[in-house]
Curated annotation (Swiss-Prot):
One of its GO terms (molecular function) is structural molecule activity. It comes from Rotavirus A (strain RVA/Human/Japan/KU/1995/G1P1A[8]). Residues 62-73 are annotated as: Interaction with the inner capsid protein VP2. It holds the Pfam family Rota_Capsid_VP6. InterPro entries: Capsid_hemagglutn, Rotavirus_A/C_VP6, Virus_capsid_a-hlx_vir. GO terms for biological process: fusion of virus membrane with host plasma membrane. The VP6 trimer contains a zinc ion located at the center of the molecule. The zinc ion is not essential for either trimerization or transcription activity of the DLP. Zinc-depleted VP6 has an increased sensitivity to proteases. This is Intermediate capsid protein VP6.
C-alpha cells in the first residue's frame, strides 16, 4: 500500500510540475525520484482486472529515464515525460479499481488483487518516498492490529432507523402518546407527543426517553444539540404498527422541559448535559441516552387553550423534540464520512463494472446494512478499499 501511495504521489507531482518552461533545477529532485521509480518498475509485468466486467489488462514496464538539462524543460522533454506519466497513471487507476472490487473474509486489510500483492514485494520497497498520508498511517496501524484514529467531520455512525413507540394507544388511534424518531448518518431527531397534552399525567408532565447504541465508540466529539425536531413538526399520516390501519399526527410544537443527554461508555456515564443547548462536547461514548419532558402549559391564552381541550376529540397533538447532530468526532474504526467521497468512489466502481456480491460487503454497498452488522471482517476490508480510494483520488478526479 505504501508503494502504491508513493507511486501516486510521485506521478501527481510529476504531472503538475514537469511542464514546459520549468527550470530543471526546480524539479531535479522530483526527476531523480521519478527515475528511481522507473528503474524499479522496469522489467516487471502485471495483470489487473478479471472480476465482474473489469477487463483483464496486462502491463509491461520498459521506459527510458528522464535526462538532465542545464536550462528549462522544452516541449520534447515534457512530451517524453508525459508518455511515461500517462501510462503509469493508467496502471495505478486499474490497480486501484481491481483492489476496490475485491474482498476477503480473512485478513481483508491485506492486498487482495494480484497486482497490489506483487507491488508489496521486497523488490519494490525502494519506491517509498512519502508515507505522510493519514489513511496510509492508519492502514499500517490496522494491518499491525494496533490502535487507529480517524478524524471525521461528520461520521456516518447511525444506521437509518425511522419508527415510533406508543406508550398509550387505542383501536381508534385518537388519543395516542409516545415517541417517534429518525436516526441516520450523524444525526438523531426524536419527538415525544401526547394527544391530550399531558392532561392526565402526574403533575401534567409526560416523560420521554430515547436510547441509541453506536456500532463503534467515538471520542472527542463536537455535537450540536437543539430543543426541536423539525422533521416531526408537520402533519402526517402514519401506518399503524400492525399495518392494519393508519393514524393522523397533527403536531403543535412545545419546548421540551428538563432535557438531559447522557453519553455512556460500556454502561458508565461519561458526560451528562442538562438543559444545555448549542455546542456540547462528549469525551468518549458508545451510547447516547436522551431524556426530556412534555409539560402541559399551566397558563394559556384562549387561543392556546383551544388547541389543547380537556377532553376528546384532540385535533392538535402536543409535541416536543430534540435534534442531536455529531459535527465531528474521532473513531478508532473506519467509517463513511459525509464530507468525503471514498464510499461513493468505491461503490461507483463496483457498480460500473458489475462486481458480483462477495462474502463481506452487502449488495450495492448498502451503508445502513453494512454499519448495522459492522463485523471485524467488514472493518478490515473497508480500511483497505477506502485507503485505495484515497490514493486513486489523487490522480483520478
Amino acid at each position: 500500500m505504501e508503494v502504491l501511495y508513493s507511486l501516486s504521489k510521485t506521478l501527481k507531482d510529476a504531472r503538475d510540475k514537469i511542464v514546459e518552461g520549468t527550470l530543471y533545477s526546480n524539479v531535479s529532485d522530483l526527476i531523480q525520484q521519478f527515475n528511481q521509480m522507473i528503474v524499479t518498475m522496469n522489467g516487471n509485468d502485471f495483470q489487473t482486472g478479471g472480476i465482474g466486467n473489469l477487463p483483464i489488462r496486462n502491463w509491461t514496464f520498459d521506459f527510458g529515464l528522464l535526462g538532465t538539462t542545464l536550462l528549462n524543460l522544452d516541449a520534447n522533454y515534457v512530451e517524453n515525460a508525459r508518455t511515461t506519466i500517462e501510462y503509469f497513471i493508467d496502471f495505478i487507476d486499474n490497480v486501484c479499481m481491481d483492489e476496490m472490487a475485491r474482498e476477503a473474509q480473512r485478513n481483508g486489510v491485506a492486498p487482495q488483487s494480484e497486482a497490489l500483492g506483487k507491488l508489496a514485494g521486497i523488490k519494490f520497497k525502494r519506491i517509498n518516498f512519502d508515507n505522510s498520508s493519514e489513511y496510509i498511517e492508519n492502514w499500517n496501524l490496522q494491518n499491525r492490529r494496533q490502535r487507529t484514529g480517524f478524524v471525521f467531520h461528520k461520521p456516518n455512525i447511525f444506521p437509518y432507523s425511522a419508527s415510533f413507540t406508543l406508550n398509550r394507544s387505542q383501536p381508534m388511534h385518537d388519543n395516542l402518546m409516545g415517541t417517534m424518531w429518525l436516526n441516520a448518518g450523524s444525526e438523531i431527531q426524536v419527538a415525544g407527543f401526547d394527544y391530550s397534552c399531558a392532561i392526565n399525567a402526574p403533575a401534567n408532565i409526560q416523560q420521554f426517553e430515547h436510547i441509541v447504541q453506536l456500532r463503534r465508540a467515538l471520542t472527542t466529539a463536537t455535537i450540536t444539540l437543539l430543543p426541536d425536531a423539525e422533521r416531526f413538526s408537520f402533519p402526517r399520516v402514519i401506518n399503524s404498527a400492525d399495518g392494519a390501519t393508519t393514524w393522523f399526527f397533527n403536531p403543535v410544537i412545545l419546548r421540551p422541559n428538563n432535557v438531559e443527554v447522557e453519553f455512556l461508555l460500556n454502561g458508565q456515564i461519561i458526560n451528562t448535559y442538562q438543559a444545555r443547548f448549542g455546542t456540547i462536547i462528549a469525551r468518549n461514548f458508545d451510547t447516547i441516552r436522551s431524556l426530556f419532558q412534555l409539560m402541559r402549559p399551566p397558563n394559556m391564552t384562549p387561543a392556546v387553550n383551544a388547541l389543547f381541550p380537556q377532553a376528546q376529540p384532540f385535533q392538535h397533538h402536543a409535541t416536543v423534540g430534540l435534534t442531536l447532530r455529531i459535527e465531528s468526532a474521532v473513531c478508532e474504526s473506519v467509517l463513511a464520512d459525509a464530507n468525503e467521497t471514498l464510499l461513493a468512489n468505491v461503490t461507483a466502481v463496483r457498480q460500473e463494472y458489475a462486481i458480483p456480491v462477495g462474502p463481506v460487503f452487502p449488495p450495492g454497498m448498502n451503508w445502513t446494512e453494512l454499519i448495522t452488522n459492522y463485523s471485524p471482517s467488514r472493518e478490515d476490508n473497508l480500511q483497505r478499499v477506502f485507503t485505495v480510494a484515497s490514493i486513486r483520488s489523487m490522480l483520478i478526479k
